[in-house]
Amino acid sequence: MDALTELAEEHADFVEKLSELEAALDEMMGTHSASDEDIELVEESVRFFEQELLPHFEREEKHLLPALERKIGRFGTLVNVVAYEHDEIRREVHKIKEALAALQAKRPAPHLAEIEELNRHVVFTIQFLWDHFRKEKTSLFATAREVLSPEELESIGVHLSG
């Protein structure tokens, strides 16, 4: 499997996790309450972001983006857009952690405002990630296949699998 296919398949795994998180937030919004199971699922999602998603971004930034930058430049290109989006998602993961901590501190007292704040950040992050993954699949990876040689793609794959 080549490097770009590997990255795209990781995206598919991430979408499944995002769907689980979205379902938990929908339940919390519908019931105006966060159960222990809901909190556990959000905590698991935060761990997933930190242990799977953000390292995925770091691998792209360390191996794929520099190779593309050498070919097409950075500013005004997809390289810059993708790097910016990675930073934005990192900021949102931090905001999700803060909102989760506020929710946990408020329970078991009424905590709808905290659920709404958590929901706001989670919904933004999920929508942003879906768009980000689509952009990488349809634009960034296509550009990489056009401008990088088979040897460069193979080298990226070796480093990604590292």
What are these regions (language model features)?
Residues 1-162:
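Small-residue-biased structural context
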